[in-house]
A protein has these predicted regions:
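Short, Lys/Arg-enriched N-terminal segments with co-localized hydrophobic residues
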Residues: 1-2, 6-17
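N-terminal auxiliary "cap/dimerization" subdomain that precedes the catalytic jelly-roll/cupin core
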Residues: 13-145, 253, 322-323
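Non-heme Fe(II)/2-oxoglutarate
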Residues: 19-48, 92, 96, 215-218, ...
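Glycine-rich nucleotide phosphate-binding loop and flanking beta-alpha elements
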Residues: 76, 170, 266
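Conserved double-stranded beta-helix
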Residues: 106-116, 120, 131-201, 206
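Short, surface-exposed loop/helix-turn segments at secondary-structure junctions
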Residues: 165-169, 232-244, 295-299
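A short beta-loop-beta micro-motif enriched in histidine and acidic residues
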Residues: 172-182, 245-246, 252, 275
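Double-stranded beta-helix
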Residues: 194-264
Length: 324
């Protein structure tokens, strides 16, 4: 696909601010300078009328910041059952031998397990929990399907960091996700405190797309899931975003849930505290935003990272308890 370069608006300390005037409005990892491109998509679709889960004030907060933290969504029994399931999976040889299981760099400690909603009946039920799925449907203004699910673990003393990134940048370039009409929800299964590497988000960063430097190597996912080196924003763009919006750590008790936009800049520090951290991530994508071909001739990533074999709307479960 031949692209016409975007129009340059102005330079800011080495970062080019652009308006989208090209075929791919969110071009990234091309042979050009790092750039900041204004978002061309809504944040809350259909004015939040598709479902009734969040209040008007909560929707406004999400639209402004690019995320929202909901506390005490799941009770102690729910959290205990889910955490036990994640711990079981992370020590099950039949699961840890799969490509879905990612270990820490330089260690055999499990860092992430992908496709958990298909590897576990309990997590499958969680994926369809009304407390999660109705929020996704309301924000995205449509029925939704599971683009990706994973459990992220950060063991005490040795859990590694996740560097700053926008999920959409990767999903757009490497998976062919057309537009910014997806979100992640992180279900906290342990207390996330200031010391054990909580998720950190940059408020307002979802309104600007950071076009990144560097072409994507073949099978990039094999390295990026351990330590991402391509599709990461340049330091000047990160500094600009942080100076504009600050950085907010999602410190909260187990049972809380963070919903954040697919383009919100986020990352987390390593965990050198004694307290492990464990969260389950569900990525809901709109049924009107299904994947196309990856950009720039890349081959599709595996199904457990980016679902594309079938796009089937998730039906909310009737029961809300996950402990049973």
């Amino acid at each position: 696909m031949r692209m016409r370069p975007p129009r340059r608006v102005r330079a800011l300390e080495g970062v080019i601010i652009m308006t989208a005037t090209m075929t791919d409005i969110y071009a990234s990892r091309t042979d050009r300078s790092a750039a900041i491109i204004a978002r061309q998509d809504p944040v809350v679709y259909g004015e939040g009328a598709y479902a009734d889960a969040l209040s008007a004030g909560q929707l406004d907060s999400y639209a402004r910041d690019g995320f929202i933290l909901l506390e005490d969504v799941f009770d102690e029994a729910d959290v205990k059952a889910l955490l036990e399931e994640i711990r079981r999976m992370s020590t099950d040889p039949a699961i840890t031998a799969l490509e879905e299981a990612i270990t820490e760099p330089g260690s055999d400690a499990v860092r992430s397990i992908f496709r958990v909603h298909e590897l576990s009946d309990r997590i499958a039920k969680l994926a369809r929990d009304p407390r999660l799925i109705h929020v996704a449907r309301q924000i995205l203004g449509s029925e939704v399907y599971m683009h990706q699910s994973r459990a992220n673990m950060k063991p005490g003393f040795k859990g590694k960091e996740f560097y700053w990134h926008s999920d959409f940048e990767t999903w757009h370039v490497e998976d062919g996700m057309p537009r910014m009409r997806a979100l992640s929800c992180s279900v906290l299964l342990t207390d996330n405190n200031a010391c054990n590497g909580p998720l950190m988000l940059v408020p307002g960063s979802h309104t600007q797309f950071i076009s990144c430097l560097g072409e994507t190597p073949d099978d990039h996912y094999k390295q990026s899931l351990k330590k991402q080196e391509y599709g990461v924003p340049d330091p000047l763009s990160l500094q600009l975003l942080a100076e504009q919006g600050g950085i907010r750590p999602m410190t909260a008790k187990a049972g809380s849930v963070v919903f954040f936009d697919c383009n919100t800049m986020h990352g987390s520090n390593g965990n050198i505290s004694p307290w492990p951290r464990a969260n389950v991530f569900m990525v809901y994508n709109s049924m009107e935003n299904t994947l196309g071909a990856p950009l720039y001739g890349l081959k599709p990533r595996p199904e457990h990272i980016a679902a594309r074999r079938r796009f089937e709307a998730l039906v909310p479960s009737e029961a809300v308890a996950t402990a049973g």
